[in-house]
């Protein structure tokens, strides 16, 4: 029976769009489900500040009157202007192992993009870099994280059969926490601190760090990440949203700021305990008992052995000068004290040599691109 594609046009259909991922991966031990309410907010123009410069459509695939796939089409106007491109993004793509389903989903986004004047389709990408991006091509037997996409091995096989080509590589790393700060690391840290007159700042109040450095943290991100592939600067609306969303829930012991002699922010490192197992137990829902599993980690500090390195950003003029050593000289003793055994990085561009040497190779994600949003049945 033919595949039918339907544009999501009601709240009921949007709920179906979100829940399809839960159903597809409910028996998979490595997938980490997003929180349902977070997804509703992400897809809502009223709740997601990225809609200031993005537009989106969501599509469901049906076969025999059953949902068999989903995909989001996104146009990030700011990214297109920054990189002088006309790209439509596809994201939140899931499908059964049937090439006609994946073809129909990607065709739907391609044709929508073409109707908006776009000439290239690319993904998986979200609205911005704060959304998960890339398609897993290795490490299918590793537990995912809340910041990454998990997919079945047949996904990248479909992409290649449909004529898509790799456009970028991301890699993730597992970093084992040392028993003691390496002597060389400590010497570099001390030297850099004296040479540039830098200071390590710590906070115990979420309100205080938000008031004094919340804006500066995300402005530093915009500055540090500007040259990276496909990055689009956070708007003021997004910055306000993320300050309210993230700073109240992080354990400030795992947040380290580095400032110069004038207290201007030079670098920031933000970590948090892995929520992967808690999110799996919650199964995407805070109710009836999902809140308890997250509460144990976030507020009762019942930490698993793994932590996530959410954010490391260094001001461009201080990059490649050892400032990262200063961050981790402060953070490593905290990790030891809290009982963490290893950390997992967020996906990092494989060509980002400024950070690659620090980590052990762990697993790889890919970004795919196709040169023009035309009929996906045409081989290229």
Predicted feature descriptions by range:
Residues 368-375:
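Conserved small/polar residues in nucleotide/adenosyl-binding loops
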Residues 81-163, 282-361, 365:
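Acyl-donor binding region in acyl/amide transferases
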């Amino acid at each position: 029976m033919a595949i039918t594609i339907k544009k999501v046009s009601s709240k009921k259909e949007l709920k179906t769009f979100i829940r399809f991922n839960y159903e597809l991966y409910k028996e998979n031990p490595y997938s980490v489900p997003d929180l349902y309410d977070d997804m509703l907010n992400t897809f809502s123009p009223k709740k997601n500040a990225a809609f200031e410069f993005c537009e989106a459509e969501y599509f469901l695939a049906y076969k025999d009157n059953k949902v068999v796939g989903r995909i989001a089409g996104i146009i990030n106007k700011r990214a297109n202007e920054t990189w002088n491109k006309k790209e439509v993004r596809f994201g939140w793509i899931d499908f059964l192992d049937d090439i006609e389903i994946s073809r129909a989903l990607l065709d739907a986004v391609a044709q929508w993009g073409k109707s908006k004047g776009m000439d290239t389709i690319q993904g998986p990408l979200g609205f911005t870099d704060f959304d998960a991006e890339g398609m897993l091509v290795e490490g299918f037997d590793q537990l995912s994280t809340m910041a990454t996409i998990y997919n079945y091995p047949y996904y990248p096989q479909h992409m290649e059969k449909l004529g898509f080509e790799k456009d970028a590589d991301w890699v993730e790393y597992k970093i084992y926490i040392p028993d003691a700060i390496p002597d060389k690391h400590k010497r570099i840290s001390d030297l850099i601190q004296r040479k540039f007159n830098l200071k390590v700042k710590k906070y115990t109040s979420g309100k205080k760090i938000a008031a004094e450095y919340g804006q500066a943290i995300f402005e530093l991100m915009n500055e540090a990440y500007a040259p990276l592939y496909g990055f689009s600067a956070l708007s003021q609306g997004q910055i306000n949203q993320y300050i309210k969303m993230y700073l109240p829930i992080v354990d400030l012991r795992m947040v380290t700021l580095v400032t110069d002699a004038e207290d201007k922010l030079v670098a920031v490192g933000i970590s948090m305990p892995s929520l992967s197992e808690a999110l799996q137990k919650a199964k995407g829902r805070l109710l009836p008992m999902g809140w308890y599993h997250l509460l144990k980690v976030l507020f009762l500090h019942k930490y698993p052995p793994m932590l996530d390195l959410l954010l490391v950003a260094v001001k461009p003029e201080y990059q490649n000068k050892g400032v990262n050593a200063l961050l981790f000289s402060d953070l490593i003793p905290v990790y030891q004290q809290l009982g963490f055994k290893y950390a997992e990085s967020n996906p990092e561009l494989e060509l980002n040599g400024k950070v690659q040497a620090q980590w052990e190779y762990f697993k790889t994600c890919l970004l795919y691109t196709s040169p023009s949003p035309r009929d996906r049945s045409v081989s290229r």
